[in-house]
Amino acid sequence: MAVSAKIEIYTWSTCPFCMRALALLKRKGVEFQEYCIDGDNEAREAMAARANGKRSLPQIFIDDQHIGGCDDIYALDGAGKLDPLLHS
């Protein structure tokens, strides 16, 4: 099954939750676009606008659908719902 979903993740370089979410995506073997927004307030505002006002990191989007943060993507994976999204 080929990965065709567009995956985007907003991160902060020293954020442990960001590192954990990135590790999951790497384990899944999927390609993703990472936006490291360290100290970039404009980028953070743009992310928050896409993420229903959420400013915490990471924020993850699959095919422009807001997934949430680290706990959210791991919950989807644990429920068996992440792979279908990644391979949509």
Swiss-Prot record:
Pfam families: Glutaredoxin. GO terms for cellular component: cytoplasm. Keywords: Disulfide bond, Electron transport, Redox-active center, Transport. The keyword Manganese does not apply. GO terms for biological process: cell redox homeostasis; cellular response to oxidative stress. GO terms for molecular function: glutathione disulfide oxidoreductase activity. Disulfide bonds join C15-C18. Has a glutathione-disulfide oxidoreductase activity in the presence of NADPH and glutathione reductase. Reduces low molecular weight disulfides and proteins. Belongs to the glutaredoxin family. This is Probable glutaredoxin ssr2061. It comes from Synechocystis sp. (strain ATCC 27184 / PCC 6803 / Kazusa).
